[in-house]
């Protein structure tokens, strides 16, 4: 969390520049597709390793394309005002990944969060943690500043509870059991951080309707609305 706090400049990078970094990340993943597929196959982490890697790469390109298209909007009102709605990053987010599809699910949480300018502390799959070490190598060679992506391995609920209680973590996403989700919500009540939890629901991460979308971008931002008068 401290490392993420030192990377606060990421939120000030323009959306266009963040998009370019994510495109570079997607290209680097693409170049190492066979390596990631072999790693998933060797550890038995995925029943469809090549398909999971391909979906991860396509998802990275999709979020790169969306990074500069979700800043906000301007809306006219019936009175002589316009409203400016700005989507701003939370800051540091905690992300708790599930065991299913350990590469794709982890990246499906990280990508929208950093696309919107957040820094993340992400807990990788508890059952298949080694994929996180390979991902670190990709992040380090993709122009992502140090501290923007921080990967942890270990017991999901214990680490999640620590992040939920941490005052410097502004938002938490949790993919795990219903009991774990309840624990996260209770632990975060003292600092009022928003928690997005699957509460035991198992997503099909290969399905774009469940594993990616504008909902993820919306959940990675906080909305600020400004009213501006005009005319006499």
Kindly give the residue locations of the regions a language model identified.
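Short alpha-helical
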Residues: 31, 35, 101, 129-130, ...
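Conserved small-residue-rich beta-alpha loop and adjacent elements
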Residues: 65, 70-145
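Glycine-rich loop-to-alpha-helix module at the N-terminal edge of alpha/beta enzyme cores
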Residues: 1-69
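Alpha-helical structural signal in soluble globular domains
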Residues: 28, 57, 64, 138, ...
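Short beta->alpha linker loops
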Residues: 43, 51, 55, 126-130, ...
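Hydrophobic packing residues within well-ordered alpha-helices of enzyme cores
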Residues: 60, 132-135, 163, 184
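Conserved NAD(P)+-binding/catalytic subdomain of aldehyde/semialdehyde dehydrogenases
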Residues: 80, 87-96, 142-232
């Amino acid at each position: 969390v401290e490392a993420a706090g030192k990377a606060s400049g990421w939120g000030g990078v323009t959306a266009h520049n963040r998009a370019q970094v994510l495109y570079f990340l997607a290209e680097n993943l693409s170049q190492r597709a066979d390596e990631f597929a072999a790693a998933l196959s060797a550890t038995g982490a995925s029943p469809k390793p090549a398909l999971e890697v391909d979906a991860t790469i396509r998802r990275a390109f999709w979020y790169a394309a969306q990074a500069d298209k979700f800043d906000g909007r301007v809306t006219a009102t019936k009175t002589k005002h316009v409203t400016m709605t700005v989507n701003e990053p939370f800051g540091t987010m905690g992300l708790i990944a599930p065991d299913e599809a350990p590469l794709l699910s982890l990246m499906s949480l990280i990508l929208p969060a950093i696309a919107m300018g957040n820094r993340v502390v992400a807990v990788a799959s508890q059952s298949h943690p080694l994929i996180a070490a390979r991902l670190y190598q990709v992040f380090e060679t993709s122009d992502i500043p140090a501290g923007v992506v921080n990967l942890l391995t270990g017991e999901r609920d214990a680490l999640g509870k620590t992040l939920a209680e941490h005052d410097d973590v502004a938002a938490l996403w949790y993919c795990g059991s219903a009991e774990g989700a309840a624990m996260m919500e209770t632990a975060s009540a003292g600092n009022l951080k928003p928690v997005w939890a699957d509460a035991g629901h198992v997503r099909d991460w290969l399905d774009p309707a469940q594993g990616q979308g504008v909902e993820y971008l919306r959940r990675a931002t906080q909305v600020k609305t400004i009213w501006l008068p005009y005319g006499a």
